[in-house]
């Protein structure tokens, strides 16, 4: 008897003919083709296994054969017991270049080119998973049923690799290996810069089809959550959302046990263990673990600020900064801490705050072992080891380790103060400064030290205070080895080596190393002394001066020398005294190399080289190097004895 192939008995339609059939006729056609195929299988016909996951390898593969394979996979089993992994390479529907999609989903109305695609899609509605995975032990006859089910047989084969650890697809450029071909193919696009999916409406291109689908201008969101009614463009987003209701976290890290609801979050987390940085900047060569970080970094080169506020026109590099800014107009704080009820204007700030309750610090520095509550803090900390300063000011070309430091610096050029207190009208350069200021009105101190109970308005002050208990000094000067508790103190100290004076008085042109010194100096021009002692009425230029002065009334001397027991009103005098014991002379003259205990002493000494005499007597015109010599001279006019 001559062999009969499926092609011999199959009935074919063109797309035009198929479009003329009604739904009952299409259903009848499907049933007949399925029954025909069952009969051929029962006659003992066998075909080579078609590995569906490698469909991409044969670009000319007949789509109709693919459709039959899917169609036949959907049945629960054949009567004669033949395995359905043996599929024919046959034709059912002919595909034309018209782009017509004749198959419509009766649930959501989505259209498909092939019946097999519709069939697969329908399973997302009804939850059908006919293929069951069974894990085999070493003995061929003995098996233990895991019971995990899959919609398609090729998914079973893919799943088996998660048990065997097989990763057959390896990137030739970076050596990364993949279980499945599709992720491997997507990964290769990162190196090539290929973006094959282009939006016909706006021309924007995408590496991944899923990103392209999400971008679509149709506004169609066919996937609706039954619990909250939220709708989604793509099924994967819908699936991820459902897990927020169920709390399911199916992706678990084998190294630390942390679980994730989304595979992308899981893969990103894995890089914290492996140190993998697959995203490399072509301009500066810097590599990144995360695509989002890479995209943000590219904006530092291009200057692009894609997020613009519609109310005030201010533009931002990052969506998080933009969202936080938008809320400053409304005053809304929609994110509330479940433990203490504190509200925040961003979800990120809320998550970070919640870690202060549980003490979680999942990010650890590989160099020094210090751990952090969030990844950005770890990355910022790592720069203290590497000295990296990736953020550059376009006006003066000064570089910074942190984007926040760059933004703060940029306001020194513009003078902009966009954040205004609604209670007193005071304006600030930074939202964090405004938040701290607002607490002076509310007296709120949300950060409490567990060791001594002292509370703080600001998280940064709280962290610095904690170091007074631990003795930690994470900031080390590479030139002299001196260590500091605060990054601000460290940066100020660096200027003693560089001689940098970035703060200039607009009235007289005098420059200062520190902004506080400039502010104090400016008060000399205005004569303003805003800080008045309530006991004696004496007024001061600076708040620090009045605090020290008040101690002369109370007798408080909080700084005591451990070696000799002598106590001091101020920390600066205490530190100066300590040097009499240690012999430390950290301030060195650049011209002659002479070292001094105090910065004031080296400044006075340097004038002996420059000839500068800034203190001039108004009565006789004589000038002096130091203020102390000048004061002694003044007494000669007054008849005083020194």
From Swiss-Prot:
UniProt GO BP: regulation of DNA-templated transcription
Coiled coil: none
Biased composition (Polar residues): 81-99
Pfam families to which the protein is assigned, alphabetical: KRAB, zf-C2H2, zf-C2H2_4, zf-C2H2_6
Keyword DNA-binding: yes
GO CC annotations on file: nucleus
Annotated region (Disordered), positions in chain: 77-99
Record InterPro entries: KRAB (IPR001909), KRAB_dom_sf (IPR036051), Znf_C2H2-type (IPR050758), Znf_C2H2_sf (IPR036236), Znf_C2H2_type (IPR013087)
CDD domains, per the entry: KRAB_A-box
SMART domains for the chain: KRAB (SM00349), ZnF_C2H2 (SM00355)
Example of a GO MF term: zinc ion binding
Domain KRAB: 4-76
Subcellular location: Nucleus
Domain of life assignment: Eukaryota
Zinc finger regions, C2H2-type: 103-125, 141-163, 169-191, 197-217, 223-245, 251-273, 279-301, 307-329, 335-357, 363-385, 391-413, 419-441, 447-469, 475-497, 503-525, 531-553, 559-581, 587-609, 615-637
Record carries keyword RNA-binding: no
Keywords on record: DNA-binding, Metal-binding, Nucleus, Repeat, Transcription, Transcription regulation, Zinc, Zinc-finger
Chief location of this protein within or outside the cell: nucleus
Function field: May be involved in transcriptional regulation.
Family: Belongs to the krueppel C2H2-type zinc-finger protein family.
Protein name: Zinc finger protein 14
Organism expressing this protein natively: Macaca fascicularis (Crab-eating macaque)
Lineage, top ranks: Eukaryota, Metazoa, Chordata, Craniata, Vertebrata
